[in-house]
């Protein structure tokens, strides 16, 4: 591993020099989305994290929801009805994006919608200042303000999960 990769890995859990894969989980309940105020990034974000080499995106989403929010969640989306030896279908992310982290590093984000199944919301104090459920109206009042992209995903998740459907068909649980 070169020195740049090593320093990125030790500070931000990056496992690749230029691009890492991440998961964001927009957990919705009663018309509100669960957000964390991230200590290191100083931003309001959904639950989420990096996909490690031995994990698939669903595993990461479930793990991060528990670690960062104290919740067991059900992922919402479509799982293809594929079968066969050596094949396991995954719920497709609702959206994908790529966002710049630094001049030399980007994240490909897999964006999931979810509902809580079990657990009590809890703050991961080492990583976050705050955790809270926010309505669409409350998104505008958060300090520091969230990015327009995160706000858009929040609004879309609240609307689609509350309505119980998304383009392309009904949401199905994991």
Where are these regions (language model features)?
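Conserved Nudix-box catalytic region and its N-terminal flanking loop in Nudix hydrolases
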Residues: 32-74, 79-83
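Short connector loops at helix/strand junctions that flank enzyme active sites
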Residues: 20, 28, 46, 68, ...
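Active-site segment of metal-dependent pyrophosphate-handling enzymes
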Residues: 70-118
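Residues embedded in well-ordered beta-strands
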Residues: 24-26, 32-34, 111-113
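Short secondary-structure boundary/capping segments
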Residues: 17, 25, 100-104, 122-124
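Acidic, metal-coordinating catalytic segment for phosphate/diphosphate chemistry
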Residues: 2-25, 30, 87-90
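Short secondary-structure capping micro-motifs at structural edges
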Residues: 13, 62, 97-101
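Nudix hydrolase/Nudix homology domain
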Residues: 39-44, 105-111, 115-174
């Amino acid at each position: 591993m070169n020195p740049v990769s090593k320093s990125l890995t030790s500070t931000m859990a990056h496992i690749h020099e230029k691009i890492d894969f991440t998961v964001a989980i927009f957990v919705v309940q009663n018309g509100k989305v669960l957000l964390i105020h991230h200590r290191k990034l100083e931003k309001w974000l959904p639950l989420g994290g990096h996909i490690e080499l031995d994990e698939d995106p669903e595993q990461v989403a479930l793990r991060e929801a528990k670690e960062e929010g104290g919740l067991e969640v059900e992922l919402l989306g479509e799982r293809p009805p594929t079968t066969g030896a050596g094949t396991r279908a995954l719920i497709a992310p609702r959206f994908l994006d790529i966002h710049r982290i630094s001049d030399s590093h980007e994240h490909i984000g897999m964006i999931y919608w979810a509902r809580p199944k079990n657990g009590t919301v809890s703050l991961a104090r080492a990583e976050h200042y705050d955790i809270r459920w926010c309505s669409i109206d409350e998104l505008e009042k958060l300090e520091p303000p969230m990015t327009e992209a995160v706000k858009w995903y929040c609004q879309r998740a609240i609307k689609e999960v509350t309505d119980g459907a998304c383009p392309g068909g009904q949401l199905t649980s994991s």
